[in-house]
Amino acid sequence: MEEGEKEYMLQIQHICKEYRTGNLVQKALDDVSLNLRDNEFVAILGPSGSGKTTLLNIIGGIDSADEGNLVIDGERLADMSEKKLSLYRRKHLGYIFQMYNLIPNLTVRENIEVGAYLSDKPLDVDELLHTLGIYEHQRKLPNQLSGGQQQRTAIGRAIVKNPDILLCDEPTGALDYNTSKEILKLIETVNQKYGNTIVMVTHNDAIKDMADRVVKLRDGMIRKNYLNEHKIPAAELDW
């Protein structure tokens, strides 16, 4: 079966987005189309200002497109009621950001359980804590954790609700090299173990080597979009 004949979990169709400041107009996205499959790891790369984060925010409902459509399971998001759209974002999307945004007065376990409350199909918290390598830290508060442990907790909060799509915006940007490698290995494990589609925005060109699909943006347009035929494990990445 050809790629174009396959059914897609999410379709991004001719998305355009502009930002206006006075008389200045910046075209952030220009006719961007992209299809995502179940369990696909997609790396979106490009320089600052290329439109990477804008695209991620539109997929996640943080921002809206001026033109174009998002289609999930055959239904246009623009046609969904506000209630259904809110449920879609809350239950089917998970977010991992560069900064961890943990709730400071909740323990590691409680931060993750917040995500579980949002789902009707949550993962087992104990199993997830073991997968994340933070079971022994589950009673600690965020300020008692290292940066890597905080990011592991943030990943746990995002993944515990078992989202269809996990959106990652520079998830290792605030971490050192060794910790970054550990977090990328963890995200790879999450993708393989739980089958989520992962969309990762990054400046780190090396991450393309661990992705199933590589999308390169420049000036708001997709310049390259290809399947990675020589995928390597995160543990073998170097930069």
Residues of each region from the PLM?
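ABC family nucleotide-binding domain
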Residues: 10-211, 216-217
